[in-house]
Amino acid sequence: MIESVLKASKIDKVLIATADGTDDSLSGDILDLQDCDSVTGIAILGDVTTTAVVTLKAYTGDEPALGDGAYETVTATVTADATSADNKLLVLDVIKPGKRYCRFDLVRATANAVVDGVIGLRYIFRTIPTTQGTDVVDSDINVN
C-alpha cells in the first residue's frame, strides 16, 4: 500500500492572513481530534521586523469551545533579526495531547510581524483514507 499525506491526514487553514501587528494574540479555528492522535500547526510568516518575537502555541481541551482549555508546555518561537524570520515557517507538533480539541494561537510581540496564515495538519488517523475538508479546493496523488 502506498502511503499518502492526502489520504492519511487532514489539512486545514486555521488562521487566515493577518496584516502586520504587534503585542497581540491571534486565535485559529478549533480542530476536532476525535479520530486522530496528533496535530501539527504550521505558521506561515511574511515580513517580520527586527526584534519581533513570534510564538506559535497550542491550546487544548475536551470541550468544543475550549472552555476547559490550557496551553501545552512546548511552543515554537522566533526572535527576528534583519532577515531570519522573513517568509519562514514556525512548526509546532502536538503528539497525543490527550485532549479532543486543539487551537493554534500565534502571539506577536515587540515589533511588527505579518502572518500569511496557519495550517493545521491532523494525522495518525484511526480510519483511513481520510477526506479533506473544504479548505482544500483540489488535490491529487501522483504515483510513478
Where are these regions (language model features)?
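Surface-exposed, low-hydrophobicity beta-strand/loop segments enriched in small/polar/acidic residues
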Residues: 1-144
